[in-house]
Amino acid sequence: DLDFPMDDEAQRISTGSEGLDNILGGGLDPNRMYLYEGSPGSGKTTIALQFLLEGVRRGERVLYVTLSETKAELELVAKRHGWSLDGIDVFELVSPDPELELTVLHPAEMELSETTQQVFDRVSETNPTRVIFDSLSEMRLLAQSPLRYRRQVLALKHFFTTRRCTVILLDDQTSEMGDLQLHSISHGVVLLEQLAIDY
């Protein structure tokens, strides 16, 4: 849960969503790791793109690491909102060919630690100030065990504490309470829900 003292507002960075910035008391504390959690279709990708586009608008380097969606799929989401991905470095760890997707991410061919190392290498090369990691659900599948998954998430956290960048991890909400271990290592958790509107 996010509880920010109000005098720190000037130091916070915008999420790219005025409404969310207002809820968060001005935005996010910089150089921290956050979790955006919600069911599929709740808007995680959209709100993640808003965060990066705000960075682009401010002249920052930004990185979208994707294990779940191709660049073409992200471009389609952006296009629906009238946005462009220009200025966003999209690092795909998913095959653009759906026929190959399962083999590309199969643990026998691409170990989880190798995937994590590729992310570290890309961040070190590009030195972004804003990073989206999409998504932890795929990392869970790659890990094949809760212990391996937790180790890799902790490795991500330890790596990013040495960088000057704000990181948002995207995750599907797997239960009503969410992933409590993941909540405990995140600086803040934003829960996204789909609401049915009565007409």
Language model regions located:
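Conserved P-loop NTPase
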Residues: 1-6, 11, 125-126, 194-199
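Pre-Walker A adenine-sensing motif
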Residues: 16-27
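Scaffold/interface architecture of coatomer-like assemblies
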Residues: 25, 33, 40, 191, ...
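Conserved catalytic network of the ASCE P-loop NTPase/AAA+ motor domain
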Residues: 26-29, 54-58, 81-85, 121-125, ...
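Conserved P-loop
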Residues: 33, 39-100
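Loop/turn-to-beta-strand initiation segments
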Residues: 61, 127-130, 161-170
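Phosphate-binding/switch loop-helix module in NTP-utilizing enzymes
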Residues: 99-161
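Phosphate-binding/switch region of NTP-binding enzymes
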Residues: 166-199
